[in-house]
Amino acid sequence: MKTTNVKNNNNNINNTDEEIKIKNNYNQNDERLKKIKENKFDWALFKRFINIIKILYAKPVIPLTLFLILFGNGFAQTYVSKFTGILLADIYASFTSGDKVFFLSSVLKAGFAIGGSALLAAIINFIVSIMAWNWRKTLCLYIQNVYFKKSLFYKILAFDDRIDNPDQRITSDIDNFTTLLASIVSQCITGPMVVVYYTYLCYTTIDWYAPLIVYGFFFLGYLINKLVMSPMVSINYLQDKLEGDFRSLHQRIRNFSESIALYSLSKEKQHPEKRFDNNDYDHGYESDDSDQSCDESTTIINRKKNKGSQYYKNKNSTSKKINDFIDKLSGDSNDQKEELLVEEEQAKIQFEALLKNKKRVIFWQLGLNTTSDLFTYLSPIANYFIIAIPVFFLNNKSVLQPGDVTVQSYNCIMLASGFSQYINVSQSISDLSGYISRISSMIEVCKKIMEDVSLDADITKLNEKVAQTHNNDAIINTGSSGNISLNNGDSITLDDVTYFTPKGNQLYSKISINVKRGNNLLIMGPSGSGKSSLIRIINGLWPFFKGSIDRPENGDMFFLPQQPYLIFGTLEEQILYPFSKKQKRIPKSIMRELFQRFEIDYLLDRERFIKKSAQVNDLTHNWLNQLSPGEQQLIAIIRLIYHKPKFALMDESTSSIPQSLEERVYYVAKELGITIISVGHRISLLKYHSTLLRFDKDKNWYLEDIINQNNQSNNINNNNNNNTNKIAEDSVFD
């Protein structure tokens, strides 16, 4: 190999204000914790709620129709309930008069009235369920559309700590929010009707003081509930976050169950005296391993578990006594001496944090339920006190008839029930508030990322750069100081590119390379040196902060990761991805030829057997578990060959396949005109590339020409040549 260019960037690292700003943008944990504390029942929460309502009613025909139907049924139910009170009074009157016929007719009429009310209540519940279903559909599709646009989901998962567990927010949080909202809307529709109608009846059957006393009684209840409910918003918000974290931990254990089991076996074979001390792991724990920062960072070993557990210690002695008491009731014990797996220990710590906050929810819920139930159960006493006022306190010596007592009592109770709906719904509102905060914050952060506000780019400098390009539409603004321009697919050029890890640590500066079509580039270096990071930057997944990149359009580039991504679908759908069967189809003969070319045509036979066995679910859901890592990589390579891009970015994409097949991959790619930028460690990769970009542990980079002494075409037999040419000439690639 001949070294043509050597660059050392150690002297080029300047902590400018711009770089400091960039680093700070990735340290968002404090901001997220601050947002948890700031979630409370206030005007800001109401404005967030209004923004969600605008989304739900963006297409107003169906939701407004359901709302009007609900309103009509609520009005009918309120009106029918009036006759229930009158008929109950008639039943009491029949007892005093001894009129049997009048009694039977009153019971029959009351039965019809109550039956009608029950039917209307069932219809209302049905409409509420339909409203929740429609709202969930609207809101979920809206957020999913934003979430998947321009790979926004990757930016959120890789860079942004402000949104924890976005999967939970899209799935369960939206479902719970819409269900609660529909229930609250139903009560808020019927509640005002009941209040207005029975305010009038109480005024006409008793006097002005009757509705006034009921109003004052429940206004006092509202104030008390407001004081109790406000802190519960942030507590419920935190509880939802902890529930999501706990679920994600077990999801990760499920995904890496085999690796965890194998590691645990090796742990059992080690003797305690031969193991490293925990202090050995503390030194140099925080590394700049950018390649692993987005994939597998913290689930294998938690070397800071002692510090993490101290966070959950209870500092309040009174609360600690209560917690210990509850632990005794539940049978918890801290005397367990059995050595736990790291994953079990992490799950235990996470679960303890979840339970601790759940206790807070339970205690605050106790206060809220107490105040709500207190005013609900005191309402009958307030009712009889109102009826007693004209008899005992206004010198009105007339004795009320049983029928009058029944009607007046019923009217007061119904008025109180209208207010009770608002008191009882306060618990639902506290839960709803947490969902509002989580859903709206996700929408807000997604919009900010789409607008590049989250990266806090220097707008002045961005405008200057746009002006310098004469407003060229081909310039893609990355929200940072780096620019990506698109060409016709002839080359990939990096000019003075400087990039960082997601934590804000600089990797390399002023990288300049030019990869022309037909000249493969190999990137080599130690693990964690930033090789994969450079691939992500070229793809546009990661921002870079200095320099420029000139590359083909996305449709002319194809990315193959080390761990292939297999969708839920058939083998044909695996090859078509990222397209679907609705957009393209592959003839069976071409499928067979492609799979034979890379010696995995037996998978097609296996698929045919699965279809004959009618194991459709196994076919569409378990390919990832059924295939070896090498088979998965070969399917991804066939996907690349089928799509035939101008450039392929391969991140150790052949690490699990034999070298004979690896050689075939590069030869087929060359025959099809696919230029490859490879990341790898194998020395055997050198002969397939013309240029080497080498990184070292000191953050130096070297660009070298590769003198290939082997003619790779001589290593592949003529039969392979004929097959390759046949595939390359097939119209399916055109």
Swiss-Prot record:
The entry's cellular-component GO terms read: ATP-binding cassette (ABC) transporter complex; peroxisomal membrane; peroxisome
GO process annotations (BP): fatty acid beta-oxidation; long-chain fatty acid import into peroxisome; peroxisome organization; very long-chain fatty acid catabolic process
Question: Which membrane topology describes this protein?
Answer: Multi-pass membrane protein
Protein's name in the database: ABC transporter D family member 1
Alphabetical list of CDD domains matching this protein: ABCD_peroxisomal_ALDP
Q: Low complexity: which segments have biased composition?
A: 712-725
Indicate the segments forming the ABC transmembrane type-1 domain, all copies: 63-351
- The portions of this protein that span the membrane are 52-72, 112-132, 177-197, 204-224, 374-394
Annotated catalysed reactions: (9Z)-octadecenoyl-CoA(in) = (9Z)-octadecenoyl-CoA(out)
The domain of life for this entry's organism is Eukaryota
Q: Which family does it belong to?
A: Belongs to the ABC transporter superfamily. ABCD family. Peroxisomal fatty acyl CoA transporter (TC 3.A.1.203) subfamily.
Under the heading SUPFAM superfamilies, the entry gives:
ABC transporter transmembrane region, P-loop containing nucleoside triphosphate hydrolases
- What are the protein's UniProt keywords? ATP-binding, Coiled coil, Membrane, Nucleotide-binding, Transmembrane, Transmembrane helix, Transport
User: Binding residues for ATP, per the UniProt record?
Assistant: 525-532
PROSITE patterns, per database record: ABC_TM1F, ABC_TRANSPORTER_1, ABC_TRANSPORTER_2
Q: Which residues form a coiled coil?
A: 332-359
Record GO terms (molecular function): ABC-type transporter activity; ATP binding; ATP hydrolysis activity; ATPase-coupled transmembrane transporter activity; long-chain fatty acid transmembrane transporter activity
The residues covered by the ABC transporter domain are 492-729
Q: Where is the composition biased (Basic and acidic residues)?
A: 271-286
Organism of provenance: Dictyostelium discoideum
Q: Which InterPro entries match?
A: AAA+_ATPase (IPR003593), ABC1_TM_dom (IPR011527), ABC1_TM_sf (IPR036640), ABC_transporter-like_ATP-bd (IPR003439), ABC_transporter-like_CS (IPR017871), ABC_transporter_sub-D (IPR050835), P-loop_NTPase (IPR027417)
In residue numbers, the region (Disordered) covers 271-296, 712-734
- Where does the protein end up? Membrane
